[in-house]
Structure formats: structure tokens, C-alpha cells
Amino acid sequence: MSNPYQNSQNGYQQNNSYELNNYPNKQYSSSNEDDFVQFMNEIQDINSQLDNYSNIINLIDNKQKNFLHGLDLNDEDTDYDSKQIENLVNEAQSLQLDLKNRIKNVQTQAVHSRDQTKVDQAETCRKRFLDLIQDYRLVEARNKESTKEQAARQYQIIKPDATDEEIKAVVEDGSQQYFQQALMQSNRRGEARSVLNEVQVRHRELLKLEKTMAELTQLFHDMEELVIEQDQPIQQIEEQVGTAQHDIEQGVGHTNKAVKSAKSARKKKLWCFFICLLIVIILAVILGAYFGTRK
């Protein structure tokens, strides 16, 4: 029996490298440059995780197909294969949560930094994650439909005259009533029980697939909503900039008024000085003429 994670690292090998020199050459101060390098390192790590996530999706797809198409309850490896798939699905769920949080963090950093390069890289990660979530949903949807078809065919082996309503109740709802009726009406109860057990196993697998699809749908919605959430800080920054600009303009206006007032006050002082000087001169002339005539 092989180890389900044997050579798993080979499955997760990186097919792409994300080099920092692929980004625009911009001038940064020493502290900003360190911040930019840290940000791009985080982007690189996220892309590596996205590679891993893609590989896990492919593994889940292949193993689900093999398990559901070749289901044999008499095979001692059946439980092992089912557990292997369950482990991969759990690993994908854990990775999804980590990716969601990390992508949200880099988008928040990018928005607050107002660095378009950071914004573009964070958005690229988000869109790539959305594409992979959609791929995973399609994988589960295909396997779900395939499982339903196989379960329906198996049920019709022991009850060829089963109606569509009955098949749906057995395959999708796991109706025990129809199971018991089919067993009672079958001439080969041993074979019928074996087939019905397989149908029940496929029904349980259907429930797992539907649960995963529901979780992926919610995750896809959350990642789409992330863009709307990130718009709010941008609007706040723009409003703050607008307010600051308005305050500056008001300050300049007040300053201009103060300058004009100061100039006006100086002019008034000069006029007062000249008027006083003129009065003194006139008085001096009058007094000089008066005392001159008396002599």
C-alpha cells in the first residue's frame, strides 16, 4: 500500500519563478525599498502557495475519478483511498484559508501605500486565486454529476423499472424506504445488497462533494467582495487628501487676506504720516511768515 503523500513535494514543485527584477524600476528611499522588497517576497510566497493549491486540486480530481469510477467495497484499499481523498480536501481547505488571509493583507498594504505596482501585484494574486477556486468548483461539479450517473445505473441493475423520482430519492436523498423495497423485491438479495451498499457509498460521496462546492462558492464570493472592501480605504484616502487640499486652499486664502490687510494698514499709516508731515510743514510756514512780519 503506497503512501498517499509519497513524493508529494514533487507534486508541489514550482513551475514558475517570480523574480523581483520583473517589476518597474522605481526610485525608493532606503526604508521604502526595504518595505517594497518585503512586500514582493510576500507576493512570491503567495504565488508559490497558489502553485501548491493548483497541484492539490489536480490530485483531488484524479483520485476522486479513480475512486468513484472503480468503487469496489470488497477491495481492502477502498477505505484507504477514501481517507486519502479526505486528507487532500482538508489540506486544500487549510490552504484556502491561509491564501484568503494573506491576499487580503497584501491588498490592504497595497491600498494604503498608494503604490500602483503593489496594487497590481496584489490584484493579480487575487484573480489567480479566483480562477483556481473556479477550477476546483468545476472539478467537484463534474465528479458530482458522474457519481450521480453511476449510482443511478447501479440502482437500475437491481430495479430496472425504477422511476426518475425513485432514482433521485435514492441517489441524491439516500432514501432508505426505496432501498428496503428494492431488497425485498430482488430475487438475488446478496447481489442486491452489495449494489445498494455501493449506491449508499456514492450518496455519501455526493454529500461531501456538495459540501465542498458550497464552501468554494462562499470563498469565491468572499474574494470577489474583497475588491469592494478595498475600495473603502481608497475613498477614505481620497477624501482625506481632498480635505487636506481644501484646508490648504483655505489657509492660502486666509494668508492672502492677511497680506492684503497688512498692506492696507501700512498704506493708511503712510497716509497718516504724510498728512501729519504736511500739517507740520504748513504750520511751520505760517508761523515763520507771522513772526517774520512782526520783526
UniProtKB/Swiss-Prot annotation:
PROSITE patterns linked: SYNTAXIN, T_SNARE
Renumbered residue ranges of the record's region Disordered: 1-31
Ranges of the Cytoplasmic topological domain: 1-270
Extracellular side: 292-295
Extent of Low complexity compositional bias: 1-18
Record protein name field: Protein transport protein SSO2
Protein family membership: Belongs to the syntaxin family.
Gene Ontology molecular function: SNAP receptor activity; SNARE binding
Keywords, comma-separated and alphabetical: Coiled coil, Membrane, Protein transport, Transmembrane, Transmembrane helix, Transport, Virulence
Residues forming coiled coils: 33-110
Recorded name of the encoding gene: SSO2
Gene3D superfamilies assigned to the protein according to its UniProt record, in alphabetical order: 1.20.58.70
Membrane-spanning residues: 271-291
InterPro entries the UniProt entry points to: SNARE (IPR010989), Syntaxin (IPR045242), Syntaxin/epimorphin_CS (IPR006012), Syntaxin_N (IPR006011), T_SNARE_dom (IPR000727)
GO cellular component: endomembrane system; extracellular vesicle; plasma membrane; SNARE complex
Bias type Polar residues, positions: 19-31
Membrane topology annotation: Single-pass type IV membrane protein
